[in-house]
């Protein structure tokens, strides 16, 4: 599943770039620092049949990070309990098995009442198609500049 958005399409006064997220490293990321970039947000899991997509995500990160693409992985255990590990275990798994260097967030819910505000924003702004139905759902947020 893939959701594709242009932040300028929203009627919601809050944007993606007004939000924050905690990283798996323990640091906080203010998403306003990513203005002017294109964001690929992916809910991820270590024990999923789609986990091999980490290789592709890392390749995208390496190929396009200098051209304005930011890949963010958001671990979630909401689909089949396929991300049961601690954040330390998730980080080690990703680095050891896939040499992940793109941003990874803390583990969050990505659907329902306790979903991370990014996913609540996406659903309220763009509708139900943004709600992940399984692991490795992708949301692409374009940051277009209009003159």
Residue ranges and their predicted role:
Residues 50-115:
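Structural microenvironment flanking redox-active thiols in thiol-disulfide oxidoreductases
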Residues 33-49, 70-75:
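Short active-site neighborhood of thiol/selenol oxidoreductases, capturing the structured segment around
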Residues 16-18, 106, 120, 140:
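Terminal helix/beta-alpha structural elements that buttress the NAD(P)+-binding lobe
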Residues 2-32, 52:
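N-terminal "domain-start" segment that seeds a small globular fold
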Residues 11-13, 129-132:
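Short loop/turn motifs at secondary-structure junctions and domain boundaries
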Residues 145-147:
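Conserved small/polar residues in nucleotide/adenosyl-binding loops
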């Amino acid at each position: 599943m893939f959701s594709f958005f242009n932040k300028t399409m929203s009627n919601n006064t809050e944007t993606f770039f007004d939000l924050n997220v905690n990283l798996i490293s323990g640091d906080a990321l203010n998403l306003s620092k990513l203005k002017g970039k294109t964001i690929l947000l992916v809910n991820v899991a270590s024990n999923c049949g789609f986990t091999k997509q980490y290789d592709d995500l890392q390749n995208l990160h390496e190929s396009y990070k200098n051209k304005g693409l930011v890949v963010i992985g958001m671990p979630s255990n909401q689909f089949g309990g396929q991300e049961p590990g601690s954040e330390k275990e998730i980080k080690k798994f990703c680095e050891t098995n896939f040499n992940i260097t793109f941003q990874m967030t803390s583990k969050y819910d990505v659907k329902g009442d306790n979903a991370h505000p990014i996913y609540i924003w996406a659903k309220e702004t763009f509708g139900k198609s943004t709600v992940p139905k399984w692991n490795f759902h992708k949301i692409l947020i374009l940051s277009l500049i209009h003159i």
